[in-house]
Amino acid sequence: MLLEQIGQPLQLRELPMPQPGPGEVRVRVLACGVCRTDLHVVDGELPEAPLPIIPGHEIVGLVDALGEGVTGFEPGQRVGIPWLGHTCGTCSYCQHAEENLCDAPQFTGYTRPGGYAEYVVADARFAFALGEEGDPVALAPLLCAGLIGWRSLVKAGDGKRLGLYGFGAAAHIVMQVARWQGRDVYAFSRPGDVAAQDFARSLGAVWAGDSGELPPVPLDAAIIYAPAGGLRRHPHERYPELSLRHPLAGARGGLGGQSHPPGRPGVLSGGRPGRYPYRNPRLPAGAGQPGTG
C-alpha cells in the first residue's frame, strides 16, 4: 500500500521485490499495526516525507533473506520491526545509548519503506527476534507503544511502587508488564478522566487518580508519559520550551532501539503478561486505509 500524495488514500501497487543490502534483512510481513503516527505520515503532519512511501511500523514477520554480514538471524525466524529503523551509530546520542535521539535517524514507514506490504527490508540492528508463540496481530502494537513503555520501564529501575503519569497506549502495556513483575502500580491521568482511571484499575493498578493528586504512599519510581511542551520549576519561572524530535515518544528515552532490546521473556517473545485481552480489528492487505483528516 503506497502513499503517493499527502492526505490521499493509499494505493495498492505492484512493486519490485526489495533486496537487502549489507547489514539488512528482508522480512515477509505477517501483520502490521496501524498507529497514530501512520496517520501523521499520511496527513503530512510529519515533515518532508519522501513520497511515494510505504507506511507502517508495527511489523511482525518472518526473515526471508539476509544481507551481507548479518548474523544472529536465519530464514524463517519470526521478528519484529519498530518505528526506529536506523541510526548513525557515531553521534553523541548513539554513543551514550540514546540512539532514539540520533542526529541522522531513519524511521520505518516514514523515511524508509514500511510494513504495509508483503515484504520489507530492515536494518538488522533494529529487528527484534520474537518467539514462536503469540498472535502476530496481538504482538504488532508491542513494536511501538510496547517498546516505548519497555525502555522507560527499564530506565525506571526495580522499585516496588511504580507511578505512571499519563495512561495511554504505552502506559497500559507497562502496567501489565509491571504487574507481571510483581510491582504495585499507581496510575495518574488527566484530571477528571474517570474512564482512564477505571481502565487502569481493571489492569491491576492498586490506585488510580488525577495527575494533581498525591499517591497514598511514597513511590520508588515514576514514568511520565507527557506531551512535548514547557516544563516549570515553579509558578514564575519556565524552562526553555522543549521541542521533541517526534512527540509520539512521550517518555524520554522511548522508541526502543538496539541499546534497550525487549529482552525479558514474555514481553516480546510471544507471551502476554497481562490479563487484558487485545481487541485489534483485523484487515486483509489492501482492504483498509489508515484514514485521513
Residues covered by each model-derived region:
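Short Gly/Pro-enriched turn/cap motifs at secondary-structure boundaries
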Residues: 5, 16-17, 51-56, 108-112, ...
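NAD(P)H dinucleotide-binding glycine-rich loop of Rossmann-like/cofactor-binding domains
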Residues: 87-165, 191
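Glycine-rich cofactor phosphate-binding loops and adjacent beta1-alpha1 units
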Residues: 156, 186, 194-254
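Cytochrome P450 core scaffold surrounding the K-helix E-X-X-R motif
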Residues: 37-39
